[in-house]
Swiss-Prot record:
InterPro entries per record: AMP-bd_C (IPR025110), AMP-bd_C_sf (IPR045851), AMP-binding_CS (IPR020845), AMP-dep_synth/lig_dom (IPR000873), ANL_N_sf (IPR042099), CaiC (IPR023456)
Keyword Cell wall biogenesis/degradation: no
SUPFAM superfamilies: Acetyl-CoA synthetase-like (SSF56801)
GO MF, any single term: carnitine-CoA ligase activity
PANTHER family, A to Z: ACYL-COA SYNTHETASE, MEDIUM-CHAIN ACYL-COA LIGASE ACSF2, MITOCHONDRIAL
Main function: Catalyzes the transfer of CoA to carnitine, generating the initial carnitinyl-CoA needed for the CaiB reaction cycle. Also has activity toward crotonobetaine and gamma-butyrobetaine.
Keywords per UniProt: Ligase
Underlying gene: caiC
Pathway named in the protein's UniProt entry: Amine and polyamine metabolism; carnitine metabolism
Family in the record: Belongs to the ATP-dependent AMP-binding enzyme family.
Protein name from the UniProt record: Crotonobetaine/carnitine--CoA ligase
Enzyme Commission designation: 6.2.1.48
One annotated GO biological process: fatty acid metabolic process
Pfam families referenced in this protein's UniProt entry, alphabetically: AMP-binding, AMP-binding_C
Amino acid sequence: MDIVGGQNLRQMWDDLAGVYGDKTALIFESCEGIVRQFSYASLNEEINRTANLFYSLGIRKGDRVALHLDNCPEFIFCWFGLAKIGAIMVPINARLLGEESAWILQNSQVSLLVTSVQFYPMYREIRQDNSTPLNHICLIGEQLPADDGVSHFSQLQARQSATLCYTPALSTDDTAEILFTSGTTSRPKGVVITHYNLRFAGYYSAWQIALRDDDVYMTVMPAFHIDCQCTAAMPAFSAGSTFVLLEKYSARAFWDQVRRYQATVTECIPMMIRTLMVQPAAPTDRQHHLREVMFYLNLSAQEKDAFTERFGVRLLTSYGMTETIVGIIGDRPGDKRRWPSIGRVGFSYEAEIRDDQNRPLPAGEIGEICIKGIPGKTIFKEYYMQPEATAGALEPEGWLHTGDSGYQDEDGYFYFVDRRCNMIKRGGENVSCVELENIISAHPKIQDIVVVGIKDAIRDEAIKAFIVLNEGETLSEAEFFSFCENNMAKFKVPSFMEIRTDLPRNCSGKIIKKNLK
């Protein structure tokens, strides 16, 4: 089923500007509370000016341009401005350091970077390396350096026409983006995303949450991440909704922002839900317009129930990854939630549970979650310049091996068990880290928890728990181990525990376990 109809991103924005005109498309709120607002027509003009800016700097169809930015309107201008001229966006995780960022520039052969003043010292140093392909930096901010090869984004953009001056032929099969995975365990891989992928994501995710043009979709997810792009921005714009982008997440400010912008839909990661739950209860907890909160793994059933009861919202499970573009398994509009199920497979996809020999498994048996889509359309096209990695993950028939363990029931509902690489082998038993984390997170004194496997000469691996306590709480080892022994099988009880003030995370909220082992 082709729901895109051959429409690329340039055509999308021209149509949106014509249909919705003065309707509010984008609202941005900075950490300082400064608000910038754009209608569909004015946002399209900003996108056109930015496209012309890139053209004036020599960027043509197929060229790659990196963005190293925190959430800001300029990210949206650049994303779609590049797409309009057939160039390719390479977003860089704003938390990456010099060596990691330089590796992405080199790997994708980026010659032009758009970044903010705060990140410039790092890139000034990178440019001193003669091997870097980077030869020009376009800076956003004030007090810009007078260095060679550096230009002022706002000044350049203001000089450009609001009418697009370069319109190469575009196909929905053209690459729009190379999005590097988080790389929590190894070097990141560049996920190639097409115009079709992004257009499909808009329609699919809008269907998933029954989005309408009178909805307001608010997010604090980083714009350089697939979740913000494909489950928030693309569906909001595709449906003609208003997209509210916040610069940073604040648990204290979150509900005030929800009320201020009359948000009807938002998305959360578990860390956000947990920090919202530890905020003092208030009479205004249910005074909002939110009808759906899309969330991503992992939360225990107790946490989900407590959140929905306190704030009076519906939690909508969405399971996916960068390679699937969208949440290909999840709750459907109007469905009764069947927790701990992660939902059913969405339209345009197939899903199976397979064993280690790549054979389908019957209901109830745990194996690898495999997804069938169309490369370059409903799932990613390939890993950039990595044919072996592509072949290892993606079968010729379109089956994607997710690397996740799960099972399905007789009714077609899927259940996530763990990342296959996130299983601890303990004395012949496979122990799911997620299962233990969900159990331990129910302890009233514990705010955050992660378990890892550490080498053990006798049992292959021992289990260690890293814990963050709620403010003002104390927890003895005896109390912790007693809780575990009363709530899980003996072979699953951790051997060690360590209390920390925080846990290392990447920009997406994923815990970087390699920093804990």
